[in-house]
Structures are given as C-alpha cells and as structure tokens.
Amino acid sequence: MSGDFDTIRDASSSDEVQLVRLLEEKIKSLQIEIENLRKELNYYKAEMEKMLSPPLIEAVVLDVLPDGRVLVRSSSGPNLVVNVASHIDQKLIKPGVSVALNQRGSTILEVLPQKEDPIVKTMEIVEKPNVTYSEIGGLEEQIKELREVVELPLKKPEIFREIGVEPPKGVLLYGPPGTGKTMLAKAVATESNAVFIHVVASEFAQKFVGEGARIVRELFEMAKRKAPSIIFIDEIDAIGAKRIDIGTSGEREIQRTLMQLLAELDGFNPLDNVKIIAATNRIDILDPALLRPGRFDRIIEVPLPDFRGRTEIFNIYLKKMKVEDNINLELLSQLSEGFSGADIKNVCVEAAYMAIRDGRNKVTMKDLVNAITKINVKRNNMESMKERREKYS
C-alpha cells in the first residue's frame, strides 16, 4: 500500500516541476512581449511629439553681436535679433550659416546642415578615377609638368612654403580632341588621392539670371569642404570665350558666370588643397583674362601623338586584348599617321569587332590594318563635311 502512495507522490511532484517550468517560460515570453510593446509605445510617443511640435522657421545668420545675440534674416521676411539656445555651440554660429528659429522667432534652436545644389552634387565623382599614368602613352613631358603643378603641391605643400614660392593655382590643357586631356586629369587625381570633381563648362550656362554664377560659387565651396580635391572643367571655352558686346540676355549671363569663375580663381590660396584643371580644344578663342598670371599659370599643350607615342598607345590597348603574336606595332604606327589616342582606341575596338564577326577569339594584324583603313575613311569624310560647311556657311 505504501508503495502505491510513493508512486502517486512522485508523479505529482514531477507534474509540479513541469508546471513550474511552463510558468517560467510563459513569464519570459510575457516579459519579451512587454518589452516589445514598450518599444512600440515609445515609438508612437515620439511620432506624436513630432506631429504635435510646431514647425521651425529657417533663417540665415547675418552677424554675431558682442553680447552673444545674433542678427538673422528670417525666411518669413524681416531681419531679427535673436538669442541662442544654451545647448548650441556658439562657435557654430557664423555669418552665412543656416539656422532654425522657434515659432515665435526669438531663439535659435538648431544649426542646419549646409545645403548643396543637386547640380553641384552630381559633379563629384565619388569613386576615385581608376586611371594611372601607365595607361597614357606618348605624353611623358605633359605628365611631368602636371605632376609638378598639381600632384606635388597637394602631397608636399611644405616644400613650397619652405622655399617661399606659390605654385600655380590652375592648369590649362589644350589640344585637339581625343589626345588624352581628360585621362591626364583623372590620372593625376588618382595618384594624388584627391576627390575628383568633373564638370563640363556648358553646365554652368543656366536658364535663370545668376544661376550659373551661384553654381560656380557652390562648386568651389564644395571643393574646399572635400579637400584635397581637383576640379576638372572640360570644354572651358563654353563660358570662357572672349567677351563681346552682343547685348543678349544669354550672353550677359555667360559673362556673369565667367566673372564669378575669375573671382573664385583669384580668391583661394594656391597652397590650399584644391587644384583647378581646365581643358579646351580652342585656346585661340579664350578670354585673355583667364590666361593672365595668377589664374591658369601653367598652360600645357597636349598634341597629337608622334610615331613613338602612337606605338606606345597601340601597345597599351593591345596588351589588354587577345591578339596573335605577329603584331607589328611600328607598322601600325606608320599607317595611323595623324591619329589621336581616341582614334587608336577606336581602331582596336573595330579590329576586335572584325574578329568577332569572323568567329575568331584573337585579333590579327590584318584586322588592325583594315580597322585603320576604316577609321581613316571616317576621318576623311568628317573633314570633307567640315570643309563644305565652312565653304557654304
């Protein structure tokens, strides 16, 4: 009889242990649920506070008064003298900074981040250009000059301070299309570990009065913030042509944009970590004001490649391709007299297409010779069309 009682007692004891475990698990799950509900409640409280809080008024700081108060221009209209909230660092309050005022417009509650024009923002190339000097053929002298003027001041400005001279602020690259001006600018940005800001000068020509000058100003401000940086202005003749008094509103706007560019070139220190490189095909039409000392001090010609240069360029492109062993680079260079670097690249691409059409996986010497002939015909046709336009225009 006693044995049956012990069995019943053991069974009830094990049931109690199991029940306790179940209750503990239930408590844990309820605690987790309470924590999740508390987070959700805090989230909705924060959202309610955002919806119920009054909007702030944007203003621009005009001046900081001796007593610590600030003169601002409110977006709602008048200029106001306001106080600064105690949680804001007084050092951040400077003329030109955007701030947020409370609804009454009596106190600065927040310093707003600096605005960037979307047009200016898209000019920055976030990824470093993947171009090196070894990928540029026949321009050793130009590379040497560019490194002295741009790369050396960015990497070792103390050398110029020690010797007591200022390096040139800007470099102007000029020469026929396709000779490697853009590649030179990208290569020096790569080697200098600088932010590369690429802009075509025609982007400065805007529809509304003053917009072009504002974009130029904001471009230079962004370059200073992102320093070390290189601004590359391609086709600068679009805004830098000689000024003539036509009197049209569009011409006046371009002249205002040019004046702003000249002011920016005059306004920064050559030893700041910002360098300007400009490129043009038409140096003959540039305004003399751009070329005067203190602006584009170093003017570098980027000519069509000579025989040795064409050989180097062919070698650079062909070593990346699958070609037969009997390629004669010297002969290719002789046949491509007058070709630019871009023309030679087109020759290599066209030769590859010829091999693909024939079902081959290697480019032959014959493909390259035929490609040179084809590109030459296109160039001659373009030149004859240009002559006809000039004749009948």
UniProtKB/Swiss-Prot annotation:
Highest taxon above the source species: Archaea
A GO molecular-function descriptor: ATP binding
GO cellular component, one term: proteasome-activating nucleotidase complex
The keyword Plastid is assigned to this record: no
Keywords: ATP-binding, Chaperone, Coiled coil, Cytoplasm, Nucleotide-binding, Proteasome
Pfam family, one: AAA_lid_3
NCBIfam families, alphabetized: PRK03992.1, proteasome-activating nucleotidase
Protein name: Proteasome-activating nucleotidase
Species name: Saccharolobus islandicus (strain Y.N.15.51 / Yellowstone #2)
